[in-house]
Design a protein with these regions (language model features):
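Basic, Lys/Arg-enriched alpha-helical interface segments
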Residues: 1-60, 66-120
Length: 120
């Protein structure tokens, strides 16, 4: 494959991923942010069970928090090409997000998360 063809293919994939993330953020999640299949459960630890994630295409995950009382969704992180979903990998999307949470960012409470997001 020529370099130009590889670049075009990579750009096409990025466009496809971006389009899917946009649709997820503005259509799928807002339609039903508390869906059972979006719940993480104990995947990244019991202390992080309030977090949600939605699968985008096969290897991308969009992580968010949702507060049903205020009806606010805060999107926090989506993995990139360096942290694709790969079970057991140190760079797996879930492992990477858990490390972020363990490091204190994003904040663990919804109130702090909302405050931080408003400051950005």
């Amino acid at each position: 494959m020529q370099v130009a063809e590889q670049t075009t293919t990579k750009n096409d994939l990025r466009k496809k991923v971006l389009k899917a993330i946009k649709r997820t953020m503005f259509e799928s999640v807002p339609a039903s942010p508390g869906r059972a299949e979006h719940r993480l459960g104990h995947t990244i630890g019991r202390e992080n069970s309030a977090w949600f994630r939605v699968k985008v295409l096969q290897q991308y995950r969009l992580f968010y928090r949702y507060d049903s009382a205020s009806k606010i969704i805060v999107y926090v992180w989506v993995n990139d090409e360096d942290s694709l979903r790969a079970y057991g990998s140190k760079t797996d999307a879930y492992a990477t997000f858990k490390k972020m949470l363990d490091g204190g960012y994003p904040p663990s409470t919804f109130e702090e998360l909302l405050k931080t997001s408003r400051e950005l």
